[in-house]
Amino acid sequence: VRSRGLGDVYKRQHPCALAVENGEVYPGVAVCGSGNGIGMTLNKHQGIRAALCWLPELARLARAHNNANILVLPGRFIEPEVALQCVDVFFSTDFEGGRHQRRIDKMPVEGCGC
């Protein structure tokens, strides 16, 4: 576990995204009020697939079908027990590959300078 601390939550997400992209940590978990702002910030990074999840089944599908590498939790809208279940499922689910990998291969924006 590596905490990026509190404060300007959006600024702190760039080091989190870079740590996941560079393989320093994998996968990542980010939490904010709704999860939307953090998810949008993280997904600006080309190598990040951050998934906003509030149910364990969403966390499973994010990993299995989208190979999400950062779990985003909406702190104001999720009970702590459910959040921990989401983390457990996210960390224990493998990516299925196959047709899902072909979809992921279409995600990067070429020539954007990202």
Q: What residue ranges belong to the model's regions?
A:
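Single conserved hydrophobic/aromatic residue that forms the stacking wall/gate
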Residues: 1-10
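Conserved functional loop/turn residues at catalytic and ligand-binding sites
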Residues: 5, 24, 66
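C-terminal binding/interaction regions
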Residues: 56-114
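Short, structured active-site "lid" loops
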Residues: 11-34
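Mid-chain, well-packed structural core segment of small domains
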Residues: 30-31, 36-76
